[in-house]
Amino acid sequence: MIYSIIICAGALLGLWILEKLLAPKDTRPPLPPGPWRKPIIGNLTDFPPKGTPEWLFWAKHQERYGPMSSLEVMGQTIIMINDAQLGIEIMHKKSALSQMIPDAPFAHMAGWGMSLATERNRQAWKTIRANMKQEIGTRRAISTFHPKMEIGIRRFLLRTLDNPDDLRFHIRKEANAFMMDVAYGYTIAPHGKDELYDLTQQSVRQFSHIFSPGEWSVNFFPILRYVPSWFPGASFQIKAAEYKRTIERMTMVPYLWIKDQVARGCSRPSILLRLLQKGHYESGSHQEQVLVWTNAEFVMGGSDTTVSAVSSFFVAMALYPEVQRKAREELDRVVGPTTLATFEHRSQLPFIDALVKEVFRWHPASPLGAPHITQEDQIWDGYLLPKGALLLPNIWTFTHDPSVYHDPMVFKPERFLEGKDSPPETDPMKFVFGFGRRICPGRFVTDEKLFLIACHAVSCFFISPKDPGAPEPDWLPGVISQPGAFDLNVVPRSPAHEELIRSIETDHPWKNADATDISRFMARNQMI
């Protein structure tokens, strides 16, 4: 056996040497600088170790190689973009030259082939994007959902008041409750088990694992998709099958449930219902899958970025009490000490608006942006970006560049306000949600929800660390990153504020949840 391995390795090395000797001389400009390429495998061993925050690992490339760096793995060129202005020039202003979506064999195996992150059928991709833009892609479109947002955020305050130690759970539940209501007309259970909510959470967790850069060997060696699951090293086949079962249920259960409601004459307004009524969708057709995935993208994409941003906001308020005090003073002065702000107040609250921008800058929800693929050779600053190269923007380095942001590690909303001697620093909204035609379609949902949660939380609560000497938490690795464990005290400012929070119970009593109905539907259709 060992001799066979040695012979194979020797043959591969010989072929590699022969290819180098016989290959015609390349007269094109060089690739951007990067670590030395090893024979055959290239930079396969130069990826971040498991559990390492990828954006911090790749930030070292900026220190060593400058605004652009490159790697190669099995013939695939990867260009790391470490400079915001360069990212805007290449992936936004010239987005037509790099709008293709990278191939992701594992994602397709895991049932995520229709996701915006992987769908390579241009017409399907455009349809999903167009549907999302129409429903949530502009501030005008989002304004139709303001009443739902306001009610949901007030319920979030109530849950936090009653059980502040479960703050992270409340943040996630509020974000998902809103998206599931908008997308499906679904009311989650305020307390207790909810199978559709649990299924959505499971899908979101799996999403981060599926799309984690460098995680799956089959993405580098696509031929491995044909290896049986029992073969040594092919455990990814088992994971792919598990994830596929989850996402198929998560996408199809609410769709079939709404179709059942329509048949029974008891459907409620939702994005999915509006799209369903616009056309006829054959069961099992590609058009049906486009419809189903449009709403899955609404729910999963919109909720997880919001959870990340809101979690980072609470950590920032605890670590920077002076910022919290200034925000509260502005709200008390403009809105009143025992009145809750609305979206109409935003133009009168410049410090809160700057605070929202600083949350996005301080720790972007997606520290590594969505990758793009070049569609033709491009030359930038004397370096070649070859056709088919994967462009990977390190958003974290964009937002922590000391030449753009003074004291970038410090949470300082004032950087976005007009100063007596200094103009506002660059608005991070230009790049934290992506570039060009791959920009996050749900960015306005996250922005507006963070604004109102910041207003209400600062108005009603004092936020502080349980351990006054606790350092800033680590941020967890993943496609969508969130702060690690960090215990907070969240207490009402006064009895009057507690009464204000509890007024939601009489203003908008809890609605009957759909959890029991969906559980029965799933059991009846053998979808559990």
Swiss-Prot record:
Named cofactor requirement(s): heme
Catalytic class of the enzyme: oxidoreductase
Residues given in the record as heme binding sites: 440
Position of the signal peptide: none
Pfam families found in the cross-reference section: p450 (PF00067)
The UniProt record lists the keyword Transferase: no
Record's catalysed reaction(s): 8-O-methylsterigmatocystin + 2 reduced [NADPH--hemoprotein reductase] + 2 O2 = aflatoxin B1 + methanol + 2 oxidized [NADPH--hemoprotein reductase] + CO2 + H2O + 2 H(+); 8-O-methyldihydrosterigmatocystin + 2 reduced [NADPH--hemoprotein reductase] + 2 O2 = aflatoxin B2 + methanol + 2 oxidized [NADPH--hemoprotein reductase] + CO2 + H2O + 2 H(+)
Keyword terms: Heme, Iron, Metal-binding, Monooxygenase, Oxidoreductase
GO MF annotation list: aflatoxin B synthase activity; heme binding; iron ion binding
Listed pathway(s): Mycotoxin biosynthesis; aflatoxin biosynthesis
Metal-binding keyword on record: yes
Enzyme Commission number: 1.14.14.117
Family matches, as CDD domains: CYP64-like
Outcome after substituting residue 423 to L: In strain: ATCC 96044 / SRRC 1273 / AF13
InterPro entries linked: Cyt_P450, Cyt_P450_CS, Cyt_P450_E_grp-I, Cyt_P450_sf, Cytochrome_P450_fung
Superkingdom, taxonomy of origin: Eukaryota
Family membership noted in the UniProt record: Belongs to the cytochrome P450 family.
Function according to Swiss-Prot or TrEMBL: Converts O-methylsterigmatocystin (OMST) to aflatoxin B1 and converts dihydro-O-methylsterigmatocystin (DHOMST) to aflatoxin B2 in the aflatoxin biosynthesis pathway.
Protein name: O-methylsterigmatocystin oxidoreductase
Organism: Aspergillus flavus
Taxonomic lineage of the native organism: Eukaryota, Fungi, Dikarya, Ascomycota, Pezizomycotina
